[in-house]
């Protein structure tokens, strides 16, 4: 079945403003009209605090409960009470890491935490900060192919390992991790697994049961919703984590992790975003429709990855980091970082911006990864399912103009 990208693009108002090409989706995706309407509707009709007995407040409670169930279905979580809402994924990573620091201070036990040099720094620095609590950091290094290989964990895991903290997909290179195999190996020695699914979220089906992880964080604004984040974890593990809370807040998930007032209208938007994704799939149940939708998105995005990698390969002076072989696109998302010989990444991004093509430059919050690549910065192009091959062609024309001539022309000349 042909992916209906033309019809999908009509649902995203931002795609039709100033003829813009949004190739910075790893920093935040655009929202469809149904999400914008749900967010605005909440502010217009029920911009009140939850927990009251009057109609609008009860509607807020119902909105949050509905969104919690929607995200649980999106994740294939067995219990919606395992889903916690908050400001962003980074704050949840910090919250869980601080809780584990308290456990190590009070009880000792396992003290080794495995982190990677492929991850966003929010899933690295937070764990490094536990060293004063007695944590010992063990580094899991990516290979030269820009990927983390689960078998490399065998030399790192031991009965001293408390946690493996890793990404499901690299926000810089797009590399996808075999997280189910990571979980299997970690659990074999009694360790837990903390997955950062922020980058992977919009690109394929998420299933916490199949992944086998113990905790997972992701972000709504990378998945076509407004700015918000969510944490999932096994209920018994979340309930056991010490957290700061006022005495009147239940010491149970999700409430113990939702201290203070978060942005309810954005949670309403997240609920609508799950509904939008569901509308792209087929099936008799909500979960089956979501899996169908995310499978369709993954397959369509594979064609975008292939076109993008081929376009970059045709331009002289371009170095692509990580998986560059179009035959291996099943191992990556359509997120590609590259540099253009002799031209700083910022200059490339500025020239593309002048052509109304939005990309990202810098270290992508992965400074250790950049060091491994012997770079201080790169240009990142990150696509999602509303992007098109025609946009890739437009990008390639602009980049070729900046580079001078296509690679084929330089070789033949």
What does each of the following model-derived ranges do?
Residues 1-413:
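Pyridoxal 5′-phosphate
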